[in-house]
């Protein structure tokens, strides 16, 4: 969101503000350059100013396709300004920046110093850093403004930019350290780090054009301050203008006129040289600041004063003489036969108006509040024989206007028509000189900018080396201090160790004394021990004799043990032979055990298969029994001995009986197949299974007998139906039930056929 899109100021509406900055802010380029397309050219932000477009060829219409660059006309900041690297030294209005100022408005940021200011009357003073925002116009005029910011403000700016530009890799902000003592060196280091961080941050074009930066640096206030300074200086320099200009201001609102007498041209050309030099200096001083905006304006004024095209001293005398003669009378139109020829100035709206004259003395008494020399106009020829200006040249409208006038842009310089050819020749010569001087000046400026850039780079490197040297010096100093502290700690530790060693020496001396006492006691004890040793030696001799006796007895026992060992070896051999026989018997028994386990498992499997077969047989018998029950045909026996079927016709009843016979035949065939499967199972299982096989056989026979009986019953019913011994029930209210039974029979039959 652009904070400056709808924040219009007094400068935007051009409310009675004169000077080059009085134009609407949409005209960003106030001087002719490669992007200036004429007098009526408006600065449009979305226009792509490529190199071809600046030279008259068709510019690139797709401005969004090209990457953004400095002064490309897309900056949303006030006046479309862009960040630039700061100059080496700020030298006021004529500061030289390391770039071409004609490209557009620029701003730079430096942190020159800091100041201690109290937040309130009670609190302690806090450190505020002076942030200097310098602005340079396309004319090369520099203005600066200071903004006070705390260190926390810089950190808040960093966090806000980090949130807005998430994908950008931002330079790290200076670390926040607690300054217990406000040392000048530490504050200076922090100031340098803040300035370097701001320049590295603003080197990104997107960040330098963001609203956060504009708000933090108060760029709009800086622009207003620039224009206020410009306006104040214009006011100061405009005090000498009324005495130099031959203009009169009428008391009638909305009208003005200039009347000039050229009765004696020869006298005009022989004016005082000193007066001309003074006027020339004043005019040059007046229009020096607008020379870059409109080049022809300053050249014409210099020509008028330098080459004597208009003698101002005689000019003022003629005006005074005319004013004393006419007084306050209104001036008429000038004719050829008149004694004096007057020149009327055409207003910008095209209407020729005549105004009363004021004397030069009244003009000098008038308070001059504003002055402007920016807009070029082309005056028309007024009456035959009047002085005019060549159609291709544009005059410079300038004048001194009081605080109550509204026609400050409606006046222009006029001169004699006889001097036109001389003026043209001089203008052409000066134009050539001016172009050559401009080319040389641009070359020198480019070289100077290169030298300044190199010097600035070298100064930056030197400053970085100084900062690095200072940091190294501080680190070395801190290291030495730390080393000294460590050595002091080690010295104190050694002193404590020496004290401990002294204590240990005293303890060792006391311990040695005690050892000496013990040694004397031990010597006395040793004497007693020697006597005891002699007694022990005698006892040892006695024990040795006993040992020899025991050794002899042991040898005898060993001989006996060897004999017994031989006997035991023989017994072990016999046991080993018996052990091999037992192992063979054990292996045979294990084989028999495995065989029995296989047989038992086989029997278990056979019983399991038999159980499954029995379950399957019972299930199939149940299924066959149900299917046999489905083959029944419903009959009702009445008292007269007639059978009544639930059928709508006789043919349908016969069809049902035939279907039932077919199904019963299929059931008999399936039962026979089941009995054959039972026989096969009996053969595969081997031998007789006893009662289970008999039960299976009986079940199959019972099913077959029932099926045959049903088939015989159906044949009997068919015969009786063919003899018309059975009556058919009329279809009535039970039609739905009969249709359901027929559908059920058909469904069962289809299932049987599918099987």
Curated annotation (Swiss-Prot):
Ranges of biased composition (kind: Basic and acidic residues): 54-74
GO cellular component terms listed in the entry, alphabetical order: cytoplasm; cytosol; endosome membrane
Keyword Heme among UniProt keywords: no
Domain PX: 107-224
GO biological process terms, semicolon-separated: protein transport
Coiled coil (residue ranges): 420-585
Pfam family membership, one: PX
Gene3D superfamilies given in the database record: Phox-like domain
Location within or outside the cell: Cytoplasm, Cytosol; Endosome membrane
Keyword presence, Protein transport: yes
SUPFAM superfamilies: PX domain
Consequence of gene loss (knockout): No visible phenotype under normal growth conditions, but the double mutant plants erex and erel1 exhibit severe growth retardation at a juvenile stage.
Keywords: Coiled coil, Cytoplasm, Endosome, Lipid-binding, Membrane, Protein transport, Transport
SMART domains in the record: PX
Topology term for the membrane: Peripheral membrane protein
Molecular-function annotations in GO: phosphatidylinositol binding
Subunit structure: Interacts (via PX domain) with RABF2A and RABF2B.
Function: Acts as an effector of RABF2A and RABF2B. Involved in vacuolar transport of storage proteins. Regulates membrane trafficking to protein storage vacuoles (PSVs). Binds specifically to phosphatidylinositol 3-monophosphate (PtdIns3P).
Name of the protein in question: PX domain-containing protein EREX
The organism of origin for this protein: Arabidopsis thaliana (Mouse-ear cress)
Gene this chain is encoded by: EREX
